[in-house]
Amino acid sequence: DKEWEVVDITEKAACFSTVNLYLRNAWYHQAIKQFIDQGEIGELAILRICHMTPGLAPGEGHEYEGPAFHDCGMHYVDIARWYAGCEYKTWHSQGVNMWSYKDPWWVQCHGTFQNGVVFDITQGFVYGQLSKDQTHNSYVDIIGTKGIARMTHDFKTAVVDLRGVTQTERIEKPFGGKNIDVLCDLFADSIETGTRNPKLPLIRDSAIASEYAWTFLHDAYTHDLPAIGELETLEQIWERRRNMKNGYGLLQKP
């Protein structure tokens, strides 16, 4: 309710406002979107998004933002909606209560948009938490009626692979992080010109992403929700992460 109260206030105000839905500002998503808009993959049909890392473990302090599928997953819920260009229509979520924690820390949701585009979103901070050498699996795989566009990254470098009807291209550039600089440039440009840059996300977009992320997460609770593993393993994960110098999503020590 508070989210929509903010939306109402900002939309009635006579000033620009925005929010950092940072994936929209990522160079790789912009490149893929342009490729799709050029008709290179035909009609957009399938959106597949995955983000699995040994990141923030349950109980480490982000619960006020919700379990992982809301705290982190809402950004992937948003970017799927951004690509589809319309609202969600149907969904089904499956979760796993890893280490027998009370909330699912891995969720996959699949369904459809109102225009018929099919999606699946997989998110979880459960990927090899106690592996000797940690890794992750993060990708976007977009399938059209004629071609494809996909992306992978290692948090340092992003690689975009474009296979269209007239173009084949591989682009490799620095990953880019949270893209605050891009957001600031777009906002400054809007102020200077007096016209809102269409690339700026609306506060409404954030509220919608948050609402659907909660909806998809809650849907997982309505289906079989296996509890796999033991809390003792989670305690080992906490201990390891407390002492890690280089890891995924480590909390800042005071």
Question: Whereabouts are the PLM-identified features?
Answer:
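Short glycine-enriched, charge-decorated loop/helix-capping segments at active-site entrances
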Residues: 63-67
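Short catalytic-loop micro-motif centered on adjacent basic/acidic residues
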Residues: 17-20, 92, 200
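A contiguous active-site-proximal alpha/beta segment in oxidoreductase catalytic domains
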Residues: 1-58
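Glycine- and charged-residue-rich phosphate/anionic-cofactor binding loop of Rossmann-like
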Residues: 167-173, 190-208
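Residue-level signal for the nucleotide or nucleotide-sugar donor/cofactor binding architecture
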Residues: 27, 71, 137, 178, ...
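Contiguous beta-strand/loop segments that form the cofactor/metal-binding neighborhood of enzyme cores
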Residues: 71, 77-157, 174, 181-196, ...
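Short arginine-rich
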Residues: 212-222
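Alpha-helical elements of Rossmann-like donor-binding domains used by nucleotide-donor carbohydrate transfer enzymes
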Residues: 5, 27, 31-34, 79, ...
